[in-house]
Amino acid sequence: MARLCAFLMVLAVMSYWPTCCLGCDLPQTHNLRNKRALTLLVKMRRLSPLSCLKDRKDFGFPQAKVDAQQIQEAQAIPVLSELTQQILNIFTSKDSSAAWNATLLDSVCNDLHQQLNDLQGCLMQEVGVQELSLTQEDSLLAVRKYFHRITVFLREKKHSPCAWEVVRAEIWRALSSSANLLARLSEKKE
C-alpha cells in the first residue's frame, strides 16, 4: 500500500505541471477519467447488491450542492475537488486494500488522483488565492459531512464485505452526480 501511495504522489507531481500550463479544459479531461472510474467501480463489485439489502443506508448525498442549476463552474470546482479527494481517501485507506481486487483498486485510485490534479489545476487558475465564499464553504462542509457518515458506517460495520459493497455503490452515485454536473456546466459554456 505504501508503494501505491508513493506512486500516486509521483503521478500527482508529474501530472500537475501539464494541467496548469496547457490551460484548463476540465470538462473534457475530467469527464473521460470520471467515466473510466465509473466503469472500474462497476467491475469492482464483488457481491450481489441483493445480498446486502440489510446494510443499505441513505448517507444523505448533498445533491443540492452539486446541482448545475444552483452552482456556477467557479463554485463547482472546489466542491468537485473535495468530493474527489474524499473518495480517494476512502479507497486509499488501509482497510480498502483488503476489500478489493488490487489491480482494479489501483486503477480507480490512479484515475481519481488524475481527476483531483485536473480539478486542483483549474482551481488554481480560476480562483487563484481568493477566499471561498460562504456558499462554497457550506457546500464543502456538506460534502465532508457526507463522507464522514460513510466512514462512520464502514467503521460501525467493521469494514464488512457488504459495507464495502454499499459504499462502492454510493461512491458510484456520487461520481455519477459529479459527471452530470460537469456535463451541464459544459453545455452552459457552449
Curated annotation (Swiss-Prot):
Belongs to the alpha/beta interferon family. The keyword Secreted applies. Transmembrane segments: none annotated. One of its GO terms (cellular component) is extracellular space. One of its GO terms (molecular function) is cytokine receptor binding. SMART domains: IFabd. One of its GO terms (biological process) is defense response to virus. This is Interferon alpha-7. Produced by macrophages, IFN-alpha have antiviral activities. Interferon stimulates the production of two enzymes: a protein kinase and an oligoadenylate synthetase. It is found in: Secreted. Keywords: Antiviral defense, Cytokine, Disulfide bond, Glycoprotein, Secreted, Signal. Glycans are attached at residue 101. Pfam families: Interferon (PF00143).
